[in-house]
Amino acid sequence: MAKRKRSAPSTTVVAGNSVTPPLALAPPQASESSHPPVNFQVITGSYDKVLHGFIVTIPPTSPSSSATSTSLTLNENDAISLPATFTDSFLFTAHTAPIRTLTISPPSANVLQKRILATSSADEHINLYTLSSALPPINFQKLKKATSTLTASNPKNKNLGVLSHHLNTPTAIIFTPNRSKIITAGLDAQIHILRTRDWAPLSMLKCPKPKPKPVNYATNHGDGYGPRIDTFNSEATYGGGAGGINDIALHPSQKILLSVGKGTRQVRMWNLMTGRKAGVLALSKEVVPPIFGSEGMKVVWSKTGGEYAIAFDRGVVVFGMDSKPKCRIRTTPISKVHQIRYINLPTTITQNKKDTEEEEEEVLTISTEDGRVLFYSTTGLESLDSPNLIGFLGGRSIGMPGRVKDFDTIALKGNFHLITGGTDGVVRIWDLGKDSEKDTHEMKKVRIDGGEGRQIGCLVGIYETERRITCLGVMEMGDEGIEEEDVEMSDSGSGSSSGSEDDDDYE
């Protein structure tokens, strides 16, 4: 009888097969001379209406040289040993329709407190939960079916309730930096501002609906005498269709809000101090080429508030505070854009040649349909159509062609981690390495349609959720027993009035 080889306890992933990495039974024990491991929780939403939370543990002494993404090659019979371990936290059905978006409230400064999780889907509801930031007891059983509750492994997690103020699908949820208010937008063309202390509505902003064009029955409907069946759209009855809001972005000063909508080539600016429209920027074909798309899908402010970016189906346009275009980004090869965010990267990775004492640089990050996450610098550009590509992660060059629906970043203990998730159900943990200057200079350049781009970062973990991911969020986790109770939230920062752009007076 042949002897079976004992499997190693480390997390392994076999490329080409849908194999779920084994669940970590316990976090690795750090030695007295080493730093404690990095712990954070990843929450994913999926087409299967399921919320899945799991804790990622990364040991302090991870072999970055052996896991460098540039030297990573996935073949059918190869196995990769990665340092990150995973522990399931909760897995349950949260909505009656696929989850559209989720948002986690910002952390408190220098204090580990509970966080608020808000999720939305096409069922018109926004579910609210309280998540504990303390590490739960180790769960030795992997959660495979969505039969558990939010408190499956941590009884400190709580269900706060449901918000039902939208008439159609909520598409965007934002918490203010001081966590005192929550801003939601939906396909019903409404923006609501609520107070998180008692979830009382404070303000409602309404975008106007585009006027329908007259229908020429003889021209548009052929020989028929009535409209075609596809002209009867139930979305118009419930506040959907053209004019619905795709995304919103809050300025760091909490005084200005941007919104982009369906069927409109424009971006609206709202004054939150008065609760009224501040202006409308029409996006002409000279500014946004037709190949980019017909409507803005995502909008985001930079962390400094000096610029904002609008993502279309196949391109991104960056505007300054004067609303003049600074940069137009068209990925090479051309691919659909799914998510954009501004993040801070160490200057050792960006290779900024300017004489500056700053250790970090803010870059625009874009995820695409072909599995890449691209990093662009929006400063020091030569022309409008010459973006500065710093590098990218993933993609077909290293055997990761699956679309990246969403991503998020977290910086803990001097380490920069980027977490990606896609419809293939795989969550990947990347270490962007603040101290990886040596690896940065040795990174291999990959040729892309006549141009060159470098793979940056190290892959430290892969986890298969076995569900099609639509959105994700990340939050820091601390040791059990150091979590403090919630403090009274401040109400300063934004207006508390109701209005729309058609109002003549403001009270």
Residue ranges and their predicted role:
Residues 34-39, 102-114, 167, 173-180, ...:
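Loop/turn segments within WD40 beta-propeller blades
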Residues 45-48, 120-123, 185-188, 195-196, ...:
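Conserved strand-to-loop turn within each blade of WD40 beta-propeller repeats
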Residues 38-40, 46, 302-303, 307-483:
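Structured C-terminal portions of repeat-based eukaryotic scaffold domains
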